[in-house]
Amino acid sequence: MFKIRSIAVRLILAISLTVAVACAILGTFSIAQQRSLTQLALDQQLKLQYDSVIAAIDYEGRAALAVSSVVAALPPVADAVARDDRDGLAALLDGAMKALTAQGIPLITFQKPPAVVVYRVHAPKVFGEDISSRRSTVVEAIKTGKQIVGVEPGREALSIFGMTPITRDGKIVANADVGAAFGKEFVDRAKKRFGIDLAVHSYDGKAFKKLSS
């Protein structure tokens, strides 16, 4: 059996083995550290993207809520809604509807308790249905008298809504419901404003459907 008798050779081998083990440990640690840093960077980027999307939704919701606040505070609007005067509402709001649509806010609807549509400025011939089954925020706004912002299914598509109850003599008589489409226009504005890549999907209980990207 071969034996190493030289102390110098033994020392060199021992040092070499120690260095090799140390390099292996450091290499393993370096790879793990690199993976950890990469994952951290990805997590931070995902959070940044998520925060940007939430900020975009919040921005659109605040804009819709601001419009609903103004509309609900107009005495002629409150009077027309109370009388179910759709022609009067059209005369008051048709011009504003065109301007708002150009700004990405294409939906204005008025509902009476519990959530019966009185008039849609954007679709004046469609009214009278109870939307409480799909618009819980409308029911809540009329019930509590509080302003609400939320994302819910509209008549044709998912939208971001801001709503303000309309009161007369201290009683809630209706709800001013203003919506920003949660579709291509929203995606385009979010991409431009925050510099993010974004797609919107909806879930119908069985599968996801892409709405816009």
Task: List the predicted regions and their residue ranges.
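Generic structural signal of hydrophobic/aromatic residues within well-ordered alpha-helices
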Residues: 38, 77, 93, 138, ...
